[in-house]
Design a protein with these regions (language model features):
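Histidine-dependent nucleotide/RNA phosphoesterase domain, centered on the 2H-phosphoesterase fold
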Residues: 1-184
């Protein structure tokens, strides 16, 4: 990071406890099929709207009111789990994810977060937004496993969170810098 006060940050939608519990059960069910994968703790899973990376204190302060306004303009929504997948789509998998079907309001919120990031001095994100929850990552090359159907149900998305991410040997630790209720 460029300065000691910088933080690694991202913007995400939080999940409800019911879906987190269902994700934990799904992970336990699929783990035997997924050799070499490191599964994320369910309490750390979220719907990332914009990864920021190194973020200065000034950028944090610029983003707070912009994210508050973006959250206020988006109503709470329901999202439906739509199955398991892997990135990349071909070859040796690196990431196991759970796809979400989300309403257009989530895409509008993601675009608002992108505009806020640009206004705070971040480069434009080149990768297209895909509504998904990262469940785990493979450490090494692995054969593509057959994935079972997954339908842990729906979740209510009602909170936008500006997170700090601290990387640790046992996994990342996410700390909210700010929370904003959708539609509030």
């Amino acid at each position: 990071m460029s300065a000691a006060a910088d933080v690694r940050a991202f913007i995400a939608l939080d999940l409800d406890a019911r879906l987190r519990e269902a994700i934990g059960e799904l992970q336990a069910r699929v783990r035997p099929r997924l050799g070499g994968i490191r599964l994320l703790r369910p309490e750390g899973i979220h719907l990332t709207l914009r990864f920021l990376g190194d973020t200065s204190p000034a950028q944090v302060e610029t983003l707070r009111p912009l994210l508050a306004a973006a959250a206020a303009a988006c109503p709470p929504v329901e999202a439906r789990v739509a199955g398991l997948g892997m990135f990349p789509e071909r070859g040796s998998p690196r990431v196991l994810w759970l796809r979400l079907d989300v309403p257009p309001a989530v895409y509008e919120l993601q675009r608002a977060c992108e505009r806020a990031a640009r206004e705070a001095g971040f480069e434009r994100e080149e990768r297209p937004f895909r509504a998904h929850l990262t469940l785990g990552r493979w450490r090494d090359r692995a054969p593509r496993p057959d994935l079972p159907p997954a339908d842990p149900g729906t979740t209510r998305l009602d909170t936008l969170v500006f997170f700090r991410s601290d990387l640790r040997p046992d996994g990342a630790v996410y700390t909210p810098l700010a929370r904003f209720g959708l539609g509030a």
